[in-house]
Amino acid sequence: MGAPKLKWTPEEETALKAGVLKHGTGKWRTILSDPVYSTILKSRSNVDLKDKWRNISVTALWGSRKKAKLALKRTPLSGSRQDDNATAITIVSLANGDVGGQQIDAPSPPAGSCEPPRPSTSVDKIILEAITSLKRPFGPDGKSILMYIEENFKMQPDMKRLVTSRLKYLTNVGTLVKKKHKYRISQNYMAEGEGQRSPQLLLEGNKENTPKPEENGVKNLTKSQVGGEVMIMGMTEKEAAAAAARAVAEAEFAMAEAEEAAREADKAEAEAEAAHIFAKAAMKAVKYRMHSQTR
């Protein structure tokens, strides 16, 4: 048996996150040799840093260890250095929102590049933008929406599946209307505005319109203050947690349905291709027989 693994301290986690932001993911040896972090991470190896960063990444993005294990199986390992750096900034922001007591500000993307869309909320906005911009009489189909997103945004490896899932979700909640495989924005959504938007869009809209603490002098709320705010809104913390759990369950159900639909579409496409090949072979056989009979 090897030596027991030491539990990571908050100082070590902070040093790892700061090191990844400074040097990039995969630069474990560089982080360990950096004099700023070497003292704090002296008891850690390259493998320790790699494993811990993987746990931080997936847990921050998926929210639980069970979902993290599924995500590790599905998440592609390929990606450019620029994508890795942008992902690292997002992960650290999701994990704790600060490094060394300072707010993390994502660097501006270089000229000529598109910032990769963030999950769910930004994808919903991109889908609505695509439908509005394409200006089809009865609305664009899913393929046209995907093509628009591919042409105007940097597509992540799993973006196609996510867009399919969000199209189904937005249809279920009434934001979109689907008819004969074409999507259009519902009249209720356009007429009632914010009241009919999906919870994700409302949350992001509120977040964007909220001034930063340093701009209006408002301090960050403590846990007790947050609990008080929840109570004022008419929900206890337990009710809020239950509502959040239901939202997560609905999102997972929608994702599962989207994956099943994608599998069925792939199967139908394969069957159609096989039928096409069979038809071509049959035509060749008929032509050969007719040619033989004319001799």
Curated annotation (Swiss-Prot):
<dbReference type="InterPro" id="IPR005818">
    <property type="entry name" value="Histone_H1/H5_H15"/>
</dbReference>
<feature type="compositionally biased region" description="Basic and acidic residues">
    <location>
        <begin position="205"/>
        <end position="217"/>
    </location>
</feature>
<feature type="domain" description="H15">
    <location>
        <begin position="119"/>
        <end position="187"/>
    </location>
</feature>
<dbReference type="GO" id="GO:0005730">
    <property type="term" value="C:nucleolus"/>
</dbReference>
<comment type="function">
    <text>Binds preferentially double-stranded telomeric repeats, but it can also bind to the single G-rich telomeric strand.</text>
</comment>
<dbReference type="InterPro" id="IPR009057">
    <property type="entry name" value="Homeodomain-like_sf"/>
</dbReference>
<dbReference type="Pfam" id="PF00538">
    <property type="entry name" value="Linker_histone"/>
</dbReference>
<comment type="similarity">
    <text>Belongs to the histone H1/H5 family. SMH subfamily.</text>
</comment>
<dbReference type="InterPro" id="IPR036388">
    <property type="entry name" value="WH-like_DNA-bd_sf"/>
</dbReference>
<dbReference type="GO" id="GO:0000786">
    <property type="term" value="C:nucleosome"/>
</dbReference>
<dbReference type="GO" id="GO:0043047">
    <property type="term" value="F:single-stranded telomeric DNA binding"/>
</dbReference>
<feature type="domain" description="HTH myb-type">
    <location>
        <begin position="1"/>
        <end position="61"/>
    </location>
</feature>
<keyword id="KW-0175">Coiled coil</keyword>
<keyword id="KW-0805">Transcription regulation</keyword>
<keyword id="KW-0539">Nucleus</keyword>
<dbReference type="GO" id="GO:0005634">
    <property type="term" value="C:nucleus"/>
</dbReference>
<dbReference type="Pfam" id="PF00249">
    <property type="entry name" value="Myb_DNA-binding"/>
</dbReference>
<dbReference type="GO" id="GO:0003691">
    <property type="term" value="F:double-stranded telomeric DNA binding"/>
</dbReference>
<feature type="DNA-binding region" description="H-T-H motif">
    <location>
        <begin position="28"/>
        <end position="57"/>
    </location>
</feature>
<dbReference type="GO" id="GO:0042803">
    <property type="term" value="F:protein homodimerization activity"/>
</dbReference>
<keyword id="KW-0158">Chromosome</keyword>
<dbReference type="InterPro" id="IPR036390">
    <property type="entry name" value="WH_DNA-bd_sf"/>
</dbReference>
<dbReference type="InterPro" id="IPR001005">
    <property type="entry name" value="SANT/Myb"/>
</dbReference>
<feature type="region of interest" description="Disordered">
    <location>
        <begin position="100"/>
        <end position="120"/>
    </location>
</feature>
<dbReference type="InterPro" id="IPR017930">
    <property type="entry name" value="Myb_dom"/>
</dbReference>
<dbReference type="GO" id="GO:0003700">
    <property type="term" value="F:DNA-binding transcription factor activity"/>
</dbReference>
<comment type="subunit">
    <text>Forms a homodimer or heterodimers with TRB1 or TRB2. Interacts with TRB1 and TRB2.</text>
</comment>
<keyword id="KW-0804">Transcription</keyword>
<dbReference type="InterPro" id="IPR044597">
    <property type="entry name" value="SMH1-6"/>
</dbReference>
<keyword id="KW-0238">DNA-binding</keyword>
<dbReference type="GO" id="GO:0000785">
    <property type="term" value="C:chromatin"/>
</dbReference>
<dbReference type="GO" id="GO:0006334">
    <property type="term" value="P:nucleosome assembly"/>
</dbReference>
<feature type="coiled-coil region">
    <location>
        <begin position="239"/>
        <end position="277"/>
    </location>
</feature>
<feature type="region of interest" description="Disordered">
    <location>
        <begin position="191"/>
        <end position="220"/>
    </location>
</feature>
<protein>
    <recommendedName>
        <fullName>Telomere repeat-binding factor 3</fullName>
    </recommendedName>
</protein>
